[in-house]
């Protein structure tokens, strides 16, 4: 049947999950059923939500203690017919988790789209393979760094930072998500100056680096700002997808004039995903929905750094971004936050080759500057791909980084 199947984790104090599931299925569709006249039931049957799965899970005493009451935990799945909503994410999310998100301890962990509905979403315009083609990098993870400390700094500072990161071997440099339109580094000037620097580095060193510029402004202006960036020569766009909404991301991704990959930043998403009792699962919001909405890259907290996700959650995000789908291109997973070269073996072990290693302080904080930081990461990536333990690598920049931040992979079998 055409539509969506929503999967929820519920903690219910009525202790009747089947009844609760039926109430949700009716409440979010036709409202009631048993008291309807038979003729009206026949008319409304195609609009009725249907419970397709109910499963009770083991009790968790810590949850009962937290809530101050005893609850029954379970998984419920409800099918919502596509006749009830238009084929767009705002309508789908409001149907499956609109007022329901306000109704007690319930968390939306997955949405399964029927094939006909999925075809309404074109997904990433470029995806992993096309990004690799643009960089001419096919056999290793990509390395990305972040502009740090740009607020209050001018274009000259940006050019110096960008040059050092590119010389260090970084593949992508992105704006900080908190760098908005300002008089010192306006959008088009950032793009043109960045392109000039990166072209110079390419001609001198033979290394190609792409620059992801942050697209900001009022929602009404975002599309025009993105086109301004593209017309100025932007390689990639960074977008705070959850500050604006998934539908705005999709609007940008589907515009044929915005012909560059889009990188979705997870800012604000923690308010939706962090609770085990409420909101969305990490894999749904930062994985599946971003991919459907057209993100070519999805940034999310890694399991290793200073804003860590549980490993299973991070891996589920990556899986939903990269699982082969005949309709959707794959998106790059970008585990982030607190990453230094000593974590590289873990990242490759856990996420494989199709991943972007994203570092801020782990590059800029290197004693030899951003050039040294980039070179340390590249040495760590090359060594890991060759099966060489990092402490055995004869590379001065990597050795310095391991001395400064440690080498957690040394004592662990990778």
UniProtKB/Swiss-Prot annotation:
Cofactor note: Binds 1 Mg(2+) ion per subunit.
Catalytic site: 99 (proton acceptor)
Matches recorded under InterPro entries: Diketo-Methiopentyl-P_enolase, RuBisCO, RuBisCO_lsu_C, RuBisCO_lsu_C_sf, RuBisCO_lsu_fd_N, RuBisCO_lsu_N_sf
Pfam families for the chain: RuBisCO_large, RuBisCO_large_N
Coiled coil in keyword set: no
Binding site for Mg(2+): 174, 176-177
Keywords (A to Z) from UniProt: Amino-acid biosynthesis, Isomerase, Magnesium, Metal-binding, Methionine biosynthesis
Pathway: Amino-acid biosynthesis; L-methionine biosynthesis via salvage pathway; L-methionine from S-methyl-5-thio-alpha-D-ribose 1-phosphate: step 3/6
Keyword Cytoplasm: no
GO process annotations (BP): carbon fixation; L-methionine salvage from methylthioadenosine
EC number(s) stated in the UniProt entry for this protein: 5.3.2.5
Sites where the protein binds substrate: 148, 174-177, 265, 338, 360-361
Record-listed N6-carboxylysine modification sites: 174
Cofactor annotation: Mg(2+)
Catalyzed chemical reaction(s): 5-methylsulfanyl-2,3-dioxopentyl phosphate = 2-hydroxy-5-methylsulfanyl-3-oxopent-1-enyl phosphate
Primary enzyme class: isomerase
A GO MF term: ribulose-bisphosphate carboxylase activity
UniProt family annotation: Belongs to the RuBisCO large chain family. Type IV subfamily.
Role, per record: Catalyzes the enolization of 2,3-diketo-5-methylthiopentyl-1-phosphate (DK-MTP-1-P) into 2-hydroxy-3-keto-5-methylthiopentenyl-1-phosphate (HK-MTPenyl-1-P).
Misc. comment: Has no RuBP-carboxylation activity.
Known partners and oligomeric status: Homodimer.
Name of the protein in question: 2,3-diketo-5-methylthiopentyl-1-phosphate enolase
Species this protein is from: Bacillus cytotoxicus (strain DSM 22905 / CIP 110041 / 391-98 / NVH 391-98)
